[in-house]
UniProtKB/Swiss-Prot annotation:
InterPro entries: Ribosomal_bL17 (IPR000456), Ribosomal_bL17_CS (IPR047859), Ribosomal_bL17_sf (IPR036373). One of its GO terms (molecular function) is structural constituent of ribosome. Belongs to the bacterial ribosomal protein bL17 family. Keywords: Ribonucleoprotein, Ribosomal protein. Part of the 50S ribosomal subunit. Contacts protein L32. GO terms for cellular component: cytosolic large ribosomal subunit. This is Large ribosomal subunit protein bL17. It comes from the Bacteria. One of its GO terms (biological process) is translation. Pfam families: Ribosomal_L17 (PF01196).
Length: 113
């Protein structure tokens, strides 16, 4: 059975939040978020990139079922995936930027390598 972090949210809210995080990440190439959210988003984003590397119609439809914007999917298949054609995983980099001012949660920047 697949394991996942609960992130203190109901399952539908967690899924929606992760879809939005991954979509924003693939759109901008970089996002700032908390460590645990970044770890979950990183895993899903890497799966999307690996699917996009296949490049077939079924892979495109699978990515479209998760990523919320069609333009992002188009960019993923035409620009991002070919860039990582020779790389087997490890498409992202995560580095800490210190605690958030309001609640002290540890923040990271997640970016494409």
């Amino acid at each position: 059975m697949a394991q996942h972090r609960k992130l203190g949210l109901p399952s539908d809210h967690r899924r929606a939040m992760l879809r939005n995080l991954v979509t924003s990440f693939l759109k901008h190439g970089k996002i700032q978020t908390t460590v645990t959210r970044a770890k979950e988003a990183r895993s899903l984003a890497e799966k999307m990139i690996t699917l996009a590397k296949r490049g077939d119609l079924h892979a495109r439809r699978q990515v479209l079922s998760f990523v919320t914007e069609e333009e992002v999917v188009k960019n993923l298949f035409t620009n991002i995936a070919p860039k990582y054609a020779e790389r087997n995983g490890g498409y992202t980099r995560m580095y800490k930027i210190g605690p958030r001012r309001g609640d002290g949660a540890e923040l990271v920047i997640l970016e494409l390598v």
